[in-house]
Amino acid sequence: MNPPNIDYVFWPASVRRYSFREHVEAAAAGGFTSLAVAPETYRRAISSGSSVAELRTIADDNGVKLRHLDSLTDWAPIRVPSEVNPELRERFDISADECFAICEALGLETILAVAGYDKGVISSDVLIDGFGRLCDRAAQSGLWVDLEFMPFWGLPDLAAAWAIVDGAQRENCGIMVDTWHFSKGTPDFELLRSLPGHRLVSVQVADAMKHQRGSTLFEDTVRFRKFPGEGQLPVVEILKILHEKGHLRHIGSEVFADEADELSPAAAGKRSAESLGRVLEAAGIPRSEPELRSKAGGFSERRPA
């Protein structure tokens, strides 16, 4: 059995062109229970004149918990890949100190650790040590750390991520399974089934066509993802495996796509929720309360006292 209260996470890829306020609006429109916040989103909000109190009030007023940091690369000696677009450079080239300060300011509960280095440039011993140190620091603040693999950079697949998590042997960490990265890289279903469930508590859900549409895998992932259930990837099968392990706590939609960029925040949030709901139902994952839903009523905003 999975935990009774699943956290439905809005990873704001589908509203990447918008500000923090619109990210909250999208999450609320879809009835998501929490929001992931990128360091650069926080930076921009603060530099535009918003206070931390105002950001937290906006989220609270709309029933959206600020819970996840997306993302941190400063656990490894290299935090930015050699070839990356300006948007991701802005996200990745941020110190661990700043990331932890953001977590403290917003009251976040989890950190998404990403490999911002190229394949084969850092030894496994260095990576295991660096990840372990990150987990130790996170544990001091009661934070959970998920390690995400991506097929086009230095941590390409589930096996590589498991080698680090298993090698680090920390209690407050696991692996983020992104259905796109898993399917487009080395989709090892046997390994996925064999891993301990307590290390697989989080999943990001996105779909795609089986064939590569972009000139590179990276272009494919940032331009041509599809909403869950609208493509050809084995999304439901992945979700079934994770659900059967009984430890899923965080389930979220993450759709980077040119198509999604054309949607309003509210429309993106609702479509994310509706499409995610359909694949969860197909995977036999029961809805928990508060139920993922399209929210009635408009976006709420007020200034803190």
State where each predicted segment sits.
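Histidine-acidic metal/acid-base catalytic patches
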Residues: 1-9, 14-31, 107, 158-177, ...
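Active-site-proximal loop/turn and secondary-structure-junction residues that shape catalytic pockets
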Residues: 14-16, 39-41, 72-75, 115-119, ...
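Active-site acidic/histidine proton-transfer and metal-coordination neighborhood
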Residues: 21-25, 60-68, 76-174, 293, ...
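Conserved beta-strand positions in the central sheet of alpha/beta enzyme cores
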Residues: 36, 68-70, 112, 146, ...
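Glycine-rich, proline-tolerant flexible connector loops at the mouths of alpha/beta enzymes
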Residues: 36-60, 115-119
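The substrate-binding groove and active-site-proximal loops of carbohydrate-active enzymes
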Residues: 41, 83-89, 225-229
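Glycine/Thr-rich phosphate-binding loops of Rossmann-like dinucleotide-binding domains
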Residues: 45, 79, 121, 211-213, ...
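Charged helix-capping and loop-helix junction motifs
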Residues: 48-54, 89, 93-96, 124-132, ...
